[in-house]
């Protein structure tokens, strides 16, 4: 009569079959987060630069008053955003004028998430660039 001893054969295979997919999903999630975060940071930087560039176009009148509604401000902000934004970003809108009783430009944009693990979604980004008194384009 042959005695069969229980062995641990196959235990490593079962553990491998469980651990590998979980590890792969974890790393896909990390990569998805990193790519999405990089895209959002680039879009925030482009929107911030565009908002400040637009704010610098606000006119300072000879009597010291500020004329906040400049037609050039939106054009300059749009061109700065187009030059600096990542390809996944799209410009939502630009409004220049008085924001919280201060001359400024507001830039809104959207950027797509990576969509590797989680479904691809749009992330909204807003930036406001205030005019620092005494710092217009002519002063630089």
Model-derived features: where do they sit?
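Alpha-helical assembly-interface signal, strongest on the long, hydrophobic N-terminal helix that forms
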Residues: 2-74
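Short, conserved structural patches
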Residues: 41, 60, 64-140
